Amino acid sequence: MDAAHFEKTLTSEVLFEGRVVTLTKDTALLENGKTATREVVHHHGGACIVPYFEDGTLCMVRQFRYAMQQELWELPAGKLEKGEDPFEAAKRELEEECGLTADHYTPLGEFYPTVGYDTEVIYMWAATGLHKTQMHLDADEFLTPDRVPLDKAYEMVMSGEIRD
């Protein structure tokens, strides 16, 4: 499909370069010939996994998220290192955060969580045929995995208890 609308980057200035993100201030040429300033957060992306047990439960994690200043329910996920294969990252997150490995992985696609100003892409897989192993959390990572029935997880999303 050909793009009907476009913006062309004319200039890009790095305002901040961190461990996780880089922030640029860009000048873009709009389709009407005018220019606009765009602030863009550049991110290496993330991998997310949906661990589904045969009994109809999911492994989810509760983790404090500093930016939101609250503990959130989440699916196991993590950021990609530069050049890291998303599938390998998803398998790593399953083991690190839930202490699980899987016999089968099904790709669920990818999505852009914040398209207005962020380049992040999150790649997702479902994991089945789960086996218990050891959790391997990073030194600065504190979370609690828990099994949540799928219908309960749906209710938690609809009630706003799961927001991530």
Where are the regions that the model predicts?
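Residue-level structural signal for beta-strand termini and adjacent loop
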Residues: 40-41, 64, 113
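A glycine-rich, hydrophobic loop/mini-helix early in the fold
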Residues: 46-70, 74
